[in-house]
């Protein structure tokens, strides 16, 4: 077992997740199998009930785990499938230890942070690091661990101590520590004091840094690198500058140029690892494809997409949607111009309350080449989502509704095409006459955490849907799997009437009862999914539905669908370099 720890000092939010993901990608280019773990010091069991405006999105995994958004970064960069146990929280660890104490597993001992909590953390890491994360079914060679928060925070203490002990247990050739720090520029001068203080804390915690990754706005001066190296007791080559790039997808290229891959090879004694020739070839092919895909987009033709949502004041609230659109734009050779619009600003009441916000919001809608409405909860801003779905439907503008976005599209269709006045969702009105969206029978209204329909679920395209653009984007297959996170569904009692009115319900669940996707046949691209396809989008393999939206908005949908069919017909029995 080999571990790469990525920790941070000074401040959070400096890019630990991207650096961790990039380090993992560089290791994969050598033909190694890589997994990832994120530790979070909060006491919540998982991210399922965290406010997206405070913490960012909740990222959902195949097994239904509701996790930190950084796990999405790992999956997107590394092309892997993680599990709920890949996200370790203080809440999970304490719950496990307390349950063991109640069972009597500790035989009457006084249960303490050291050794019981720290041992539990180490045991958890060693167990998860061995879980296969790709189609091969083989255990990973290297585990990337991102330490949430910053070293020195009170709540991070048990994790820091556990990782310090793990470093000692594994030995020098099996544990490499990357410390990420921020180098601010004040009056044109690169300031090194924050980094010096941060590394001093790291050292005092027992995590001697093997690499110091300095986040900065520009390329670091050699004098700054030398100063940091001397004050932190490392060599110059162990200090790498991670400057701002045009896109985050160029960070792996930058880190390779800065010498991180060589440091990883040396620090982990990777020359002793047995990498088969086929795996080495896959690694090189992956690197070649990455470099070809992530070219700068400055000279590409733009495509203007608007995201209409409830939590747009924080970009991280819809991080996976943003990334999936970026992946899709790269695939279509377009520069993504994404504008987020608060759905509440599109509502008639806003015209009286704040005319400027109302007109600005609708101006973005008018200029858009495509519209996406992602998931969400609650009644706020729903009318705005309904109105923008009507705009897209009537003006033949490419539209993609995800989860709540699909449900509001169904509500709009029921109201304005079927003539069902006041049609709505049971989430917004439990007594309305026409509840075209209802609470799922198996859901719980008493307990919120972990009670939704979560994780990977199967959708079956119905016979006669060969015309479906969405089905075409999947390569014309009969069955697909996407991740879900919802409590409400299209009311089965209205399925027949919706289809008679012209709304095609193109796929259903395993039982053929629950609506999974909707489409309009006579529209350039009007698609809704109950699933969250953004969670499975990869940098080198965009989510088909989001790729379809960008392609339709860019005028190349037919080309993309044709390519999907060709890939599907040629992929049988052929391994994918993006997934190993």
From Swiss-Prot:
Q: Which family does it belong to?
A: Belongs to the CTP synthase family.
**One GO biological process from the UniProt record?**
pyrimidine nucleobase biosynthetic process
Short name of one Pfam family = GATase
Q: Which residues form the Glutamine amidotransferase type-1 domain?
A: 304-559
Answer whether the UniProt record assigns the keyword Ligase to this protein: yes
Q: What does this protein do?
A: Catalyzes the ATP-dependent amination of UTP to CTP with either L-glutamine or ammonia as the source of nitrogen.
What NCBIfam families has UniProt attached to this entry? Answer: PRK05380.1 (NF003792), PyrG (TIGR00337)
* Gene name in the database record: URA7
Catalyses: UTP + L-glutamine + ATP + H2O = CTP + L-glutamate + ADP + phosphate + 2 H(+)
Its GO CC terms are:
cytoophidium; cytoplasm
**Catalytic center at which residues?**
403, 532, 534
Instruction: Name its pathway.
Output: Pyrimidine metabolism; CTP biosynthesis via de novo pathway; CTP from UDP: step 2/2
- EC annotation from Swiss-Prot or TrEMBL: 6.3.4.2
Q: Does the keyword Cell inner membrane apply?
A: no
Protein name in the entry: CTP synthase
Q: What molecular functions are annotated in GO for this chain?
A: ATP binding; CTP synthase activity; identical protein binding
| Top-rank taxon, per record | Eukaryota
The entry's keywords: ATP-binding, Glutamine amidotransferase, Ligase, Nucleotide-binding, Pyrimidine biosynthesis
User: What InterPro entries does this protein map onto?
Assistant: Class_I_gatase-like, CTP_synthase, CTP_synthase_N, GATASE, GATase1_CTP_Synthase, P-loop_NTPase
